[in-house]
């Protein structure tokens, strides 16, 4: 099991060189290689991988996005979105989006550090993932236009070997395309793949070092 004792260690570890692309690629869809050069017109975005304790065991907050026909429609993801002109930093973006989408105040979140950014071609987004810690179980106020529901996942269960699969996925926004992709199969209804899985993969590698 992964306990809250890991938080201070993670804070230190995120200041060291990160596993980066090598760790992310463990869960990258086989349809493409990640570009080595990020386009100049990439849109800056940020997400928050929020950890919180349940009986001293670290859980990870995920959300199920609404089915709205957008590139990430219906997917399991982290709270997050595009950088706004009112955001001084990308950390501010991640915290603002988390509050807007699930109702958790920025003042209650301890931002531990940043994971490795990654480019998502389908949405032209350069995503900056941040790791946060909430010292108590969250209370939610969901944005019904963006989030169907939340999923609380104990890290040690998500990282179990049997949770990793390779499958064929037809994205809701692109019904004519089938991707071969590695994924975390949380249960029969919840498949975590794409950028979210790649971010989780780096966190998993960090915690297993």
Regions found by a protein language model. Name each.
Residues 1-75, 82-100, 104-112, 118-128, ...:
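N-terminal leader/linker segments that precede catalytic domains of diphosphate-processing enzymes
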Residues 76-77, 125-127, 145, 166:
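Short, glycine/charged-enriched secondary-structure capping and boundary segments
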Residues 142-182, 186:
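NUDIX/MutT-family hydrolases
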């Amino acid at each position: 099991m992964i306990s809250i004792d890991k938080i201070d260690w993670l804070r230190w570890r995120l200041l060291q060189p990160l596993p980066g692309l090598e760790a992310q690629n463990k869960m990258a869809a086989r349809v493409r290689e990640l570009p080595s050069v990020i386009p100049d017109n990439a849109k800056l975005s940020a997400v928050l991988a929020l950890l919180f304790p349940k009986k001293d065991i670290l859980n990870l907050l995920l959300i199920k996005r609404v089915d709205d026909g957008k590139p990430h429609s219906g997917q399991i993801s982290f709270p997050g979105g595009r950088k706004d002109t009112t955001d001084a930093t990308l950390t501010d973006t991640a915290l603002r989006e988390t509050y807007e989408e699930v109702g958790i105040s920025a003042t209650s979140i301890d931002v531990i550090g940043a994971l490795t950014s990654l480019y998502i071609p389908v949405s032209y987004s350069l995503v900056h993932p941040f790791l946060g810690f909430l010292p108590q179980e969250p209370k939610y106020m969901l944005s019904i236009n963006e989030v169907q529901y939340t999923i609380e996942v104990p890290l040690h269960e998500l990282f179990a070997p049997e949770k990793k699969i390779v499958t064929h996925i037809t994205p809701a926004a692109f019904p004519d395309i089938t991707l071969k992709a590695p994924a975390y199969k949380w249960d029969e209804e919840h498949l975590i793949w794409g950028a979210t899985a790649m971010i989780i993969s780096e966190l998993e590698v960090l915690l297993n070092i």
